[in-house]
Amino acid sequence: MGVFTYESEFTSEIPPPRLFKAFVLDADNLVPKIAPQAIKHSEILEGDGGPGTIKKITFGEGSQYGYVKHKIDSIDKENYSYSYTLIEGDALGDTLEKISYETKLVASPSGGSIIKSTSHYHTKGNVEIKEEHVKAGKEKASNLFKLIETYLKGHPDAYN
């Protein structure tokens, strides 16, 4: 098994506490509402929403995938960090065993957020990860951040 690690960084005008509430703590409700073509719904299969929780995310009709299951590894509400592992679903294909994600929101000098994300792709055997697969994932994540940011700008009282 090989492990390939990729890092990415996004910026937002929204401060970390508010963005963390929307993007992490209430994403299961917010994302299907603002991007139903991407995420149809999310459900907890096991756990209470904290570390160890298993979630099933069903993608919307606009997605090339049907569903994924992920396990929450950690949530740190004080330091605005979140990690989870994608453990099942057609997004893994035949080449990936799992994908682990670590996300941390830090305050930017302008009062917004810097979103730092690290992805660890665990392959089956000696398979190499195609760069376009990683770029496509980064683009989807960036677009989702932009949708959430747009929603928060348009709803200034939400998630305060």
Swiss-Prot record:
InterPro entries reported for this sequence: Bet_v_I/MLP, Bet_v_I_allergen, Plant_def-hormone_signal, START-like_dom_sf
Q: Which Pfam families match?
A: Bet_v_1
Keywords, in A-Z order: Allergen, Pathogenesis-related protein, Plant defense
**Keyword Transcription regulation found:** no
* CDD domains reported in the protein's UniProt record: Bet_v1-like
Q: Name one GO biological process term.
A: defense response
For the keyword Cell membrane, the answer is no
* A GO molecular-function descriptor: protein phosphatase inhibitor activity
* GO cellular component terms attached to this protein's record: cytoplasm; nucleus
Q: Which family does it belong to?
A: Belongs to the BetVI family.
Name by which UniProt lists this protein: Major allergen Pru av 1
Which species does the entry assign this protein to? Answer: Prunus avium
The root-end lineage is: Eukaryota, Viridiplantae, Streptophyta, Embryophyta, Tracheophyta
